[in-house]
């Protein structure tokens, strides 16, 4: 049975969490004092919130961490009845460990309704002796102020490129293979600061038997930078038909959707040497195209319109 690398190589201690030195130092201080406040981890997907919570539990409880760490996902259980019944029942139970409390980790807490959060705040107050709540969310602004004021808020940033490279190289070494520079850069690019995504891509390309930028873009659903650069160049220079042919190839031969193409173009444009004013206009055009496609508009028509807008913007540059 194939083991999932995101689980196999999940950090086992706080020291193994990369790029969050300030947060890790605070957590280590809590561990040393054997005292833990309620916590709120805020940050985008793949920035290490869950891994940090698990590493914290391991350091606090040692080998018995699984018995003292309850993980729930609020997106699956976001109603007030769940708070009043299930979570309340879990929170009231006193654990048998020497610390006298357990951790209830609630992922995607920003998916809870305001009413459910209000009920949860009361549960936190009632059972703070037996349960420490650790919340994880993408947007702290969606967490009601009464909960924020009762937690230590820690913000997690996208993982820096150097730490993603370090982790991927560690995994590759342990699995007995190497990653060439071009493939590494491609994985860093498509991960966008998401460590979990980077590790999943690495396992996927390794399993495919081909570690190359081409395979990476194929697996992740991105167009190759070469194709995207050609598309942008043709569009900016007003070569509408040639740009459409490139889009046709991406969609028909490479199997990319309209959203895939828009995201690929956006990634290249952000790093391009297009003048700032025109770059802003192109990004606005990309945002409009993405919105319309998501709302159900025809991919082909929206991509044609996008090429036309980029051509118009390009005429101002030329």
Swiss-Prot record:
Q: Which GO terms describe its molecular function?
A: ATP binding; ATP hydrolysis activity; DNA binding; DNA clamp loader activity
Task: Kindly state which keywords UniProt assigns to this record, in alphabetical order.
Answer: ATP-binding, DNA replication, Nucleotide-binding
Name one matching Pfam family.
Answer: RCF1-5-like_lid
- Residues binding ATP: 43-50
| Record-annotated disulphide pairs | none
SUPFAM superfamilies assigned: P-loop containing nucleoside triphosphate hydrolases, post-AAA+ oligomerization domain-like
* Single Gene Ontology BP annotation: DNA-templated DNA replication
Name a GO CC annotation attached to this entry: DNA replication factor C complex
Q: How does it assemble?
A: Heteromultimer composed of small subunits (RfcS) and large subunits (RfcL).
The record's function comment reads:
Part of the RFC clamp loader complex which loads the PCNA sliding clamp onto DNA.
Q: What is this protein called?
A: Replication factor C small subunit
From which organism does this entry originate? Thermoplasma volcanium (strain ATCC 51530 / DSM 4299 / JCM 9571 / NBRC 15438 / GSS1)
Gene it is expressed from: rfcS
